[in-house]
């Protein structure tokens, strides 16, 4: 096989001109953003969803999620991931599955789902799709499935299949994050202890999927074996970096959230214990006063 090498300076100066304005991406994101703005604007009033409008922070988070999707799929990162580097593709996947969904969910007011929950069939489907067992399984199965080398290569070769892959990534990632971040009363998040178990499972799943990729002695993705070499990275090094990006990136994020939730839960438990102890002291004090009053009345 004859390897093609790019001059670093020439490549670096030209890569910034590689923007891919795919109509399906632009139209899809425009529809999603338009629907969101309608729901938090005219739709909120017309449907009587809430007297409380979406906050500036919520709007900023949702719009940020759309911008990140847009940049991930049309910017030079897309060119790098589709034609040169497996590691760039994994960075793209990190953005689409671990950064975009939390921002998107945090940007949706809890009252936005009231119309859906009024229809029994839709409410049943929504509860099913946000069940933590379903969300955990769906995300990890989809993520693992699309990283099988043969299917991965096919998705990169065919744009429509690649679009489907990204749609499945984002949709199942939103499902995966929902039990952790929901602000909806109708579709509430799980308890703090359950969140910790959930995050621990996600961290382990990331290791199981990407450890074989990271520690493989041979390149697993034929597509990148035949790709031009840039930045003096050979195929195996690129693959190892990609595996580390996913394994470490996902693991660090999940464990950081685990620690944060644990500390919050532990503090709440301490506060509850102190509150119960205080109430018990007050009850005992009232009992003692009552007993003293009774004894005094008897003696008198």
Name every feature range the model reports, one short phrase each:
Residues 2-300:
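Alpha-helical membrane segments of multi-pass proteins
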